[in-house]
Regions:
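A structural boundary/capping signal
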Residues: 3-171
């Protein structure tokens, strides 16, 4: 959004982005931030429904591990929930959308669409992983390379691992 003096700083989209940018990074709810940005692209996205579904998935993953689980155990449960068919996900995994391998179809980058279709790309897949990982208390972030996004996960020893969500969430 190009904003010049007096041109649109009060526009709701600009205000939404300014509000996100005013939050200290450690306090950012990644899921809420991503859905806020997604709504700038598609205002028909129901943020409440999308965020509720992310919270439900996080709760389902939490139920797969003990209260005192390690980072590795929580990350393994997250990976398994998303990419392994089982009773925890009713046999419905999340997978790469080979019909849009370069991610040119913009709706495929939106979390609401990924949650609905379970077909994603190198934007929606790592961003859902990050949103869920944050809710599971994992230290994660996004890393980029040309035309690609992957996840950085810090383990209990402070070592960072690259997680490739488009190929089953393996380091």
């Amino acid at each position: 959004f190009a904003v010049t003096a007096g041109s649109g700083a009060s526009h709701p989209h600009v205000q939404a982005v300014q509000q996100l940018l005013s939050i200290p990074e450690p306090d950012v709810d990644f899921a809420a931030a991503k859905v806020t940005i997604d709504r700038l692209i598609d205002p028909h996205i129901d943020a409440e429904v999308t965020l509720r579904r992310i919270d439900e998935i996080a709760a389902e993953i939490r139920a797969l591990v003990t209260f005192r689980s390690t980072t590795q155990q929580r990350a393994a449960a997250l990976r398994s929930y998303l990419y392994d068919a089982g009773p925890w996900n009713k046999g419905q995994t999340f997978s790469y959308d080979f019909n849009d391998p370069l991610g040119r179809h913009l709706p495929n980058k939106l979390l609401a669409n990924y949650l609905r279709t379970r077909k994603g790309n190198c934007v929606s897949m790592p961003f859902l992983y990050i949103a869920l990982a944050q809710k599971l208390g994992l230290t994660v972030g996004a890393a980029t390379s040309p035309r690609h996004v992957f996840v950085k996960l810090r383990d209990d020893h402070g070592t960072w691992h690259n997680i490739e969500t488009v190929s089953g969430g393996w380091p």
